[in-house]
Amino acid sequence: MCLQVGEFVKQFYIVDSRMDLPCYCINLDDRPERWEETKAAFEGTDIVPKRFPGIRHTEGWKGCGASHVAIAREAMRRGLPWVLVLEDDCDPVADFTARWPTVKEALWAERDSWDIFLGGPTFIQGPAEPLGPLTRIEGAYALHFYVLRASAYEKALAWNPDRHGPIDVYYSDQFRIVITQPMLAVQRRSISDNEEEEVDYGYLFRRSEHVMQQLLYSARTREGTIGLLVFSAVLLCLMWFRKRR
Protein backbone atom coordinates (compact mmCIF):
# COMPACT_ATOMS: atom_id res chain seq x y z
CA MET A 1 0.00 0.00 0.00
CA CYS A 2 2.81 2.41 0.95
CA LEU A 3 4.55 1.63 -2.34
CA GLN A 4 1.37 2.36 -4.31
CA VAL A 5 0.88 5.68 -2.51
CA GLY A 6 4.53 6.53 -3.12
CA GLU A 7 4.21 5.83 -6.83
CA PHE A 8 1.06 7.98 -7.00
CA VAL A 9 2.80 10.88 -5.28
CA LYS A 10 5.80 10.47 -7.58
CA GLN A 11 3.61 10.51 -10.69
CA PHE A 12 1.67 13.53 -9.43
CA TYR A 13 4.88 15.40 -8.69
CA ILE A 14 6.25 14.71 -12.18
CA VAL A 15 3.11 16.11 -13.82
CA ASP A 16 3.05 19.11 -11.49
CA SER A 17 6.75 19.87 -11.96
CA ARG A 18 6.32 19.90 -15.74
CA MET A 19 3.80 22.70 -15.30
CA ASP A 20 6.34 24.81 -13.42
CA LEU A 21 7.27 27.78 -15.58
CA PRO A 22 10.86 28.99 -15.09
CA CYS A 23 11.28 32.70 -15.75
CA TYR A 24 14.31 34.66 -16.96
CA CYS A 25 14.59 38.44 -17.17
CA ILE A 26 17.09 39.90 -19.63
CA ASN A 27 19.09 42.70 -18.00
CA LEU A 28 22.33 44.39 -19.03
CA ASP A 29 25.01 44.58 -16.35
CA ASP A 30 25.03 48.39 -16.42
CA ARG A 31 21.26 48.62 -15.83
CA PRO A 32 20.80 47.30 -12.26
CA GLU A 33 17.97 49.77 -11.56
CA ARG A 34 15.85 48.23 -14.32
CA TRP A 35 16.31 44.77 -12.85
CA GLU A 36 15.16 46.05 -9.45
CA GLU A 37 12.13 47.74 -11.04
CA THR A 38 11.09 44.55 -12.81
CA LYS A 39 11.47 42.42 -9.69
CA ALA A 40 9.33 44.90 -7.77
CA ALA A 41 6.72 44.98 -10.55
CA PHE A 42 6.13 41.21 -10.27
CA GLU A 43 6.08 40.98 -6.48
CA GLY A 44 2.85 39.38 -5.32
CA THR A 45 2.50 37.27 -8.46
CA ASP A 46 3.58 33.65 -8.85
CA ILE A 47 6.36 34.83 -11.18
CA VAL A 48 9.82 34.95 -9.64
CA PRO A 49 12.20 36.04 -12.40
CA LYS A 50 15.84 35.04 -12.47
CA ARG A 51 18.22 37.63 -13.87
CA PHE A 52 19.78 36.68 -17.22
CA PRO A 53 22.78 38.86 -18.18
CA GLY A 54 21.99 40.64 -21.43
CA ILE A 55 24.45 40.59 -24.31
CA ARG A 56 25.85 43.99 -25.22
CA HIS A 57 26.31 44.84 -28.90
CA THR A 58 27.15 48.06 -30.73
CA GLU A 59 23.83 47.58 -32.52
CA GLY A 60 21.34 47.24 -29.70
CA TRP A 61 18.81 45.11 -31.55
CA LYS A 62 21.45 42.50 -32.32
CA GLY A 63 22.44 42.23 -28.67
CA CYS A 64 18.76 42.00 -27.75
CA GLY A 65 18.23 39.16 -30.22
CA ALA A 66 21.34 37.31 -29.08
CA SER A 67 20.10 37.53 -25.48
CA HIS A 68 16.75 35.97 -26.37
CA VAL A 69 18.45 33.20 -28.32
CA ALA A 70 20.78 32.54 -25.38
CA ILE A 71 17.77 31.92 -23.15
CA ALA A 72 16.30 29.48 -25.69
CA ARG A 73 19.66 27.70 -25.71
CA GLU A 74 19.70 27.52 -21.90
CA ALA A 75 16.11 26.23 -21.82
CA MET A 76 17.02 23.54 -24.34
CA ARG A 77 20.11 22.58 -22.33
CA ARG A 78 18.00 22.22 -19.19
CA GLY A 79 15.30 20.24 -21.01
CA LEU A 80 12.58 22.71 -20.05
CA PRO A 81 9.17 22.10 -21.69
CA TRP A 82 8.61 25.87 -21.69
CA VAL A 83 10.16 29.08 -20.39
CA LEU A 84 8.86 32.56 -19.57
CA VAL A 85 11.03 35.44 -20.77
CA LEU A 86 10.84 39.05 -19.60
CA GLU A 87 12.68 42.14 -20.72
CA ASP A 88 13.67 44.54 -17.96
CA ASP A 89 11.15 47.22 -18.97
CA CYS A 90 8.19 44.87 -18.54
CA ASP A 91 5.23 45.86 -16.37
CA PRO A 92 2.24 43.59 -15.65
CA VAL A 93 -1.20 45.15 -16.13
CA ALA A 94 -3.39 46.00 -13.14
CA ASP A 95 -5.41 42.74 -13.16
CA PHE A 96 -2.45 40.51 -14.01
CA THR A 97 -2.57 38.51 -10.77
CA ALA A 98 -6.25 37.71 -11.26
CA ARG A 99 -5.95 36.63 -14.89
CA TRP A 100 -2.50 35.06 -15.25
CA PRO A 101 -3.28 31.71 -13.53
CA THR A 102 -6.17 31.05 -15.94
CA VAL A 103 -4.05 31.96 -18.96
CA LYS A 104 -1.17 29.80 -17.73
CA GLU A 105 -3.47 26.79 -17.26
CA ALA A 106 -4.89 27.30 -20.75
CA LEU A 107 -1.40 27.52 -22.22
CA TRP A 108 -0.49 24.19 -20.65
CA ALA A 109 -3.76 22.55 -21.71
CA GLU A 110 -3.36 23.79 -25.31
CA ARG A 111 0.43 23.35 -25.43
CA ASP A 112 0.36 21.31 -28.64
CA SER A 113 -1.40 24.18 -30.46
CA TRP A 114 1.25 26.90 -30.15
CA ASP A 115 4.98 27.64 -30.07
CA ILE A 116 5.02 31.10 -28.48
CA PHE A 117 2.63 33.07 -26.29
CA LEU A 118 2.96 36.86 -26.48
CA GLY A 119 1.68 38.63 -23.37
CA GLY A 120 1.84 42.14 -24.82
CA PRO A 121 1.78 41.92 -28.62
CA THR A 122 2.03 44.83 -31.05
CA PHE A 123 1.44 45.04 -34.82
CA ILE A 124 -0.99 42.13 -34.64
CA GLN A 125 -1.87 40.31 -37.86
CA GLY A 126 -5.11 38.36 -38.21
CA PRO A 127 -7.25 36.49 -38.73
CA ALA A 128 -7.90 35.42 -35.14
CA GLU A 129 -9.06 32.04 -33.85
CA PRO A 130 -10.39 31.98 -30.26
CA LEU A 131 -9.14 29.14 -28.02
CA GLY A 132 -10.90 29.80 -24.71
CA PRO A 133 -8.92 32.56 -22.95
CA LEU A 134 -6.32 32.35 -25.72
CA THR A 135 -6.45 33.53 -29.32
CA ARG A 136 -4.40 32.18 -32.20
CA ILE A 137 -3.16 34.87 -34.62
CA GLU A 138 -0.98 34.98 -37.73
CA GLY A 139 1.71 37.36 -36.50
CA ALA A 140 2.73 39.98 -33.91
CA TYR A 141 5.80 41.68 -32.46
CA ALA A 142 7.18 42.62 -28.98
CA LEU A 143 9.06 40.25 -26.67
CA HIS A 144 8.93 41.98 -23.28
CA PHE A 145 6.73 39.14 -21.93
CA TYR A 146 6.44 35.79 -23.69
CA VAL A 147 6.38 32.06 -23.13
CA LEU A 148 8.42 29.87 -25.48
CA ARG A 149 7.73 26.16 -25.85
CA ALA A 150 10.35 23.48 -26.45
CA SER A 151 8.92 23.07 -29.96
CA ALA A 152 10.44 26.48 -30.81
CA TYR A 153 13.93 26.13 -29.35
CA GLU A 154 15.72 24.83 -32.45
CA LYS A 155 14.24 27.50 -34.72
CA ALA A 156 15.11 30.16 -32.15
CA LEU A 157 18.73 29.03 -32.23
CA ALA A 158 18.73 29.32 -36.03
CA TRP A 159 18.20 33.12 -35.86
CA ASN A 160 20.73 35.06 -37.93
CA PRO A 161 20.54 38.86 -37.51
CA ASP A 162 22.02 39.60 -40.93
CA ARG A 163 19.52 37.34 -42.68
CA HIS A 164 16.44 37.51 -40.47
CA GLY A 165 16.43 41.01 -38.97
CA PRO A 166 15.04 41.81 -35.48
CA ILE A 167 14.35 38.82 -33.29
CA ASP A 168 10.65 39.57 -32.76
CA VAL A 169 10.10 39.74 -36.52
CA TYR A 170 11.85 36.39 -36.92
CA TYR A 171 9.80 34.77 -34.15
CA SER A 172 6.60 36.13 -35.71
CA ASP A 173 7.51 34.57 -39.06
CA GLN A 174 8.56 31.20 -37.64
CA PHE A 175 6.22 30.32 -34.77
CA ARG A 176 2.58 29.48 -34.10
CA ILE A 177 1.45 32.43 -31.98
CA VAL A 178 -1.21 32.73 -29.30
CA ILE A 179 -2.15 35.81 -27.30
CA THR A 180 -4.79 36.80 -24.78
CA GLN A 181 -7.11 39.79 -24.74
CA PRO A 182 -6.82 42.08 -22.88
CA MET A 183 -3.04 41.82 -22.87
CA LEU A 184 -1.14 40.91 -19.71
CA ALA A 185 1.95 43.12 -19.87
CA VAL A 186 3.20 46.39 -21.31
CA GLN A 187 6.53 48.21 -21.43
CA ARG A 188 7.21 51.10 -19.09
CA ARG A 189 8.72 54.32 -20.38
CA SER A 190 12.50 53.96 -20.41
CA ILE A 191 15.69 54.24 -22.44
CA SER A 192 15.56 51.76 -25.32
CA ASP A 193 18.81 50.10 -26.39
CA ASN A 194 17.22 49.48 -29.78
CA GLU A 195 16.09 53.08 -30.29
CA GLU A 196 18.97 54.57 -28.24
CA GLU A 197 16.61 57.10 -26.64
CA GLU A 198 13.77 57.26 -24.14
CA VAL A 199 10.61 55.76 -25.58
CA ASP A 200 6.99 55.38 -24.51
CA TYR A 201 5.16 52.57 -26.32
CA GLY A 202 1.83 53.23 -24.62
CA TYR A 203 0.16 54.27 -27.87
CA LEU A 204 1.22 50.99 -29.51
CA PHE A 205 -0.36 48.90 -26.79
CA ARG A 206 -3.58 50.93 -26.90
CA ARG A 207 -3.73 50.46 -30.66
CA SER A 208 -3.01 46.74 -30.29
CA GLU A 209 -5.85 46.32 -27.78
CA HIS A 210 -8.20 47.90 -30.30
CA VAL A 211 -6.95 45.61 -33.09
CA MET A 212 -7.37 42.54 -30.87
CA GLN A 213 -10.95 43.52 -30.06
CA GLN A 214 -11.75 43.95 -33.75
CA LEU A 215 -10.18 40.62 -34.72
CA LEU A 216 -12.02 38.75 -31.97
CA TYR A 217 -15.31 40.40 -32.91
CA SER A 218 -14.80 39.36 -36.53
CA ALA A 219 -13.91 35.80 -35.49
CA ARG A 220 -16.95 35.44 -33.24
CA THR A 221 -19.24 36.98 -35.84
CA ARG A 222 -17.87 34.53 -38.40
CA GLU A 223 -18.41 31.61 -36.00
CA GLY A 224 -21.95 32.81 -35.33
CA THR A 225 -22.69 33.06 -39.04
CA ILE A 226 -21.34 29.57 -39.69
CA GLY A 227 -23.37 28.22 -36.78
CA LEU A 228 -26.51 29.85 -38.14
CA LEU A 229 -25.88 28.39 -41.60
CA VAL A 230 -25.38 24.91 -40.17
CA PHE A 231 -28.54 25.23 -38.09
CA SER A 232 -30.49 26.39 -41.14
CA ALA A 233 -29.17 23.48 -43.21
CA VAL A 234 -30.16 20.96 -40.54
CA LEU A 235 -33.61 22.53 -40.26
CA LEU A 236 -34.13 22.34 -44.03
CA CYS A 237 -33.09 18.67 -44.03
CA LEU A 238 -35.57 17.89 -41.26
CA MET A 239 -38.35 19.67 -43.15
CA TRP A 240 -37.47 17.75 -46.31
CA PHE A 241 -37.57 14.41 -44.50
CA ARG A 242 -40.93 15.27 -42.92
CA LYS A 243 -42.40 16.01 -46.35
CA ARG A 244 -41.08 12.68 -47.66
CA ARG A 245 -42.82 10.70 -44.91
For each feature predicted by the language model, list its residue ranges.
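An acidic/histidine-cluster motif and surrounding catalytic segment
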Residues: 2-86, 90-245
